[in-house]
UniProtKB/Swiss-Prot annotation:
PANTHER family on file: WD REPEAT-CONTAINING PROTEIN 18, WD-REPEAT PROTEIN 18
Subunit note: Component of the 5FMC complex, at least composed of PELP1, LAS1L, TEX10, WDR18 and SENP3; the complex interacts with methylated CHTOP and ZNF148. Interacts with NOL9. Component of the PELP1 complex, composed of at least PELP1, TEX10 and WDR18. The complex interacts with pre-60S ribosome particles.
Localization, UniProt: Nucleus, Nucleolus; Nucleus, Nucleoplasm; Cytoplasm; Dynein axonemal particle
The WD repeat ranges on this chain: 36-75, 78-116, 119-158, 170-211, 213-257, 267-306
GO BP term, pick one: rRNA processing
Protein keywords: Cytoplasm, Developmental protein, Nucleus, Repeat, WD repeat
Broad class of where this protein is predominantly found: nucleus
Function: Functions as a component of the Five Friends of Methylated CHTOP (5FMC) complex; the 5FMC complex is recruited to ZNF148 by methylated CHTOP, leading to desumoylation of ZNF148 and subsequent transactivation of ZNF148 target genes. Component of the PELP1 complex involved in the nucleolar steps of 28S rRNA maturation and the subsequent nucleoplasmic transit of the pre-60S ribosomal subunit. May play a role during development.
The protein, known as: WD repeat-containing protein 18
Assigned GO CC terms: dynein axonemal particle; nuclear pre-replicative complex; nucleolus; nucleoplasm; rixosome complex
Gene from which this protein is expressed: WDR18
Classification via PROSITE patterns: WD_REPEATS_1 (PS00678), WD_REPEATS_2 (PS50082), WD_REPEATS_REGION (PS50294)
Stated family: Belongs to the WD repeat IPI3/WDR18 family.
Organism whose genome encodes this protein: Homo sapiens
């Protein structure tokens, strides 16, 4: 069986004939071009291996193509303002877009706009999901990086503004890029900023693991899959390699190009805007405002290929080519629905839209029925009260009552455990 093909997907801000170009990583052969406007920075996303999404530069819509129908624009997803960044969940169920200082979350299966998050104070500059789609991270020009639990966002009370799980405020200037490693809720996140630092965080605890200070502002950051190396693109065109596994235990360190001359990629003549690493970690892809995309050998730091584009590069990423990209007979499993511009229920009350099923998870119910945990706590309180009154007599009746209450507590605990096990299996069941 042949190894999966790796492809480079690139966009620039001035191409008159196409919006996105796809070429084979190692041979440089041009495979596909998608037509229809220019994609903005951090504005490219692959949806479920079937659709390509591109947030149009300075426009209030997102273009969507079927991977094989490259010359036919499938849909324009309208937004209330220019889209500043875009991403799709790895499981293909959700799409996130930054519009000014707000984050819009759509459900792909129905096209419903589920929630608008407004916790940033300035424009959102970058968005990314964790590998298991359980969390997403947002960075903004307000110098903040926010970690969101998708489950908490979807279950939030509509009358309250959802709160992020973590707020990282250690950067002093706007966030330029972020990269989330593998590990789901245990992943590490690298963030870059105009304050000339790159910081490494842990999603689960929210702790700052590492801060690296450079001589220039850092415009792009990425890591290899093994997280041995962190690559940082500078505003003057250099790319710096930070070896994570060789560092001592200190949390802060400065990167000196003179001392670390063997860890610098030199070739770009303007700021580096995007970085991506191949699956095996041997090749680095970079895009720059000098209108070139370069392919580097990580070991030797030599440029092995240069591709000239028509304008400043806005996106450049290495992807494993999905089957739908290489097969002319492939068609999406489901058509892309119309994406709604307004929040679910804003125009149609609380009734679900036709053609879809609305599930409201975790919303407060109309009744006030206590949960099993509340009932258990109440029974335990009654049990303690009864035991305190045992000195008043009726020892036999008390023992019978205590036994009954203990049996009831055990029964409720079993019900609670069974309900938890069922919920876990249902939530973690793979999508068909």
């Amino acid at each position: 069986m042949a190894a999966p093909m790796e492809v480079a997907v690139c966009t620039d801000s001035a191409a008159p004939m196409w919006s996105c170009i796809v070429w084979e990583l190692h041979s440089g052969a041009n495979l596909l071009t998608y037509r229809g406007g220019q994609a903005g920075p951090r504005g490219l996303a692959l949806l479920n291996g079937e659709y390509l999404l591109a947030a149009q530069l300075g426009k209030n819509y997102i273009s969507a193509w079927e991977l094989q129908r490259k010359d036919q624009l499938q849909q324009k997803i309208m937004c209330p303002g220019p889209v500043t960044c875009l991403t799709a969940s790895p499981n293909g169920l959700y799409v996130l877009a930054g519009v000014a200082e707000s984050i819009h979350l759509w459900e792909v299966s129905t096209g419903n706009l589920l929630v608008i998050l407004s916790r940033h104070y300035q424009d959102v500059s970058c968005l990314q999901f964790t590998g298991d789609s359980s969390h997403f991270i947002s960075g903004g020009k307000d110098c903040l990086v926010l970690v969101w639990s998708l489950c908490s966002v979807l279950q939030a009370d509509p009358s309250r503004i959802p709160a992020p799980r973590h707020v990282w405020s250690h950067h002093a200037l706007p966030i330029t890029d972020l990269h989330c490693g593998f590990g789901g809720p245990l992943a590490r996140v690298a963030t870059s900023s105009l304050d000339q630092t790159v910081k490494l965080w842990e999603v689960s605890s929210g702790e700052l693991l590492l801060s690296v200070l450079f001589d220039v502002s850092i415009m792009a950051v990425t890591m290899d899959l093994a997280e041995h190396h962190m690559f940082c693109g500078g505003s003057e065109g250099s790319i710096f390699q930070v070896d994570l596994f060789t560092w001592p235990g200190q949390r802060e360190r400065s990167f000196h190009p003179e001392q670390d001359a063997g860890k610098v990629f030199k070739g770009h003549r303007n700021q580096v805007t995007c970085l991506s690493v191949s699956t095996d970690g041997s090749v680095l892809l970079s895009g720059s405002h000098d209108e070139t995309v370069r392919l580097w050998d990580v070991q030797s730091k030599q440029c092995i290929r240069t591709v000239a584009l028509k304008g400043p590069v806005t996106n450049a990423a290495i992807l494993l080519a999905p089957v739908s990209m290489l097969s002319s007979d492939f068609r999406p499993s489901l058509p892309l629905p119309h994406f709604n511009k307004h929040l679910l229920g804003a125009e149609h009350g609380d009734e679900p839209r036709h053609g879809g099923l609305t599930l409201r998870l975790g919303l407060h119910q109309q009744g006030s029925e206590p949960s099993y945990l509340d009932r258990t706590e109440q029974l335990q309180a009654v049990l303690c009260s009864t035991m305190e009154k045992s000195v008043l007599g009726g020892q036999d009746q008390l023992r019978v009552r205590v036994t009954e209450l203990e049996d009831e507590v055990r029964n409720l605990r079993k019900i609670n455990r069974d309900l938890f096990d069922f919920s876990t299996r249902f939530i973690t069941r793979p999508a068909k």
